[in-house]
């Protein structure tokens, strides 16, 4: 009961790196630092897609990661909000001529896109906050149905 009360007012994010240079991942880590402190906005990072409201996907989707990304997406509860972070996640970026499928939207549906190489931490936070209401509304609906 207490866990659900706290979850109701927060947004839980799972970061998935599907290849690339890790530049976007470094910017996501910067979001956790005191300068940005995403937890002040009620945003928490998890490594379990089953706990996530939002998937933040970085890097181009490599051939090795395509099926794994689909599996992770399927494990994520509804509404399965996906945010593609950075140029590589949008189009394959500088890796598009390599062994990649392309951007994230070639493999799973994408709800929001953050351009940049890498994007600024503030852009990442703003985008998560823009998609948060949809995730929170869906979670509340699930909880209400569970109680009935």
From Swiss-Prot:
Cofactor(s) for this UniProt protein: [4Fe-4S] cluster
Co-factor note (free text): Binds 1 [4Fe-4S] cluster.
InterPro entries according to UniProt: Complex_I_20kDa-like, NADH_UbQ_OxRdtase-like_20kDa, NADH_UQ_OxRdtase_20Kd_su
Sample GO molecular function, one term: quinone binding
Residues bound to [4Fe-4S] cluster: 21, 24, 88, 117
Gene3D superfamilies: 3.40.50.12280
Entry-linked PROSITE patterns: COMPLEX1_20K
Alphabetically ordered keywords of this record: 4Fe-4S, Iron, Iron-sulfur, Metal-binding
Pfam family, one: Oxidored_q6
Keyword 4Fe-4S: yes
Superkingdom assignment: Archaea
Classification via PANTHER family: FORMATE HYDROGENLYASE SUBUNIT 7-RELATED, HYDROGENASE-4 COMPONENT I
Protein family: Belongs to the complex I 20 kDa subunit family.
Protein's name according to its UniProt entry: Uncharacterized protein MJ0516
């Amino acid at each position: 009961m207490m866990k659900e009360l706290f979850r109701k007012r927060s947004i839980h994010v799972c970061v998935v790196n599907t290849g690339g240079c890790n530049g976007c991942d470094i910017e996501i880590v910067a979001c956790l630092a005191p300068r940005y402190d995403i937890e002040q906005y009620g945003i928490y990072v998890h490594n379990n897609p089953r706990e996530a409201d939002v998937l933040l996907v970085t890097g181009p989707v490599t051939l090795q990661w395509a099926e794994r990304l689909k599996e992770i997406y399927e494990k994520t509860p509804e509404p399965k909000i996906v945010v593609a972070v950075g140029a590589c996640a949008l189009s394959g970026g500088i890796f598009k001529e390599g062994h990649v499928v392309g951007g994230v939207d070639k493999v799973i549906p994408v709800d929001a896109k953050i351009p940049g190489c890498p994007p600024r931490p503030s852009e990442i936070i703003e985008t998560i906050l823009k998609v948060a209401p949809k995730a929170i509304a869906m979670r509340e609906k699930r909880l209400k149905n569970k109680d009935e």
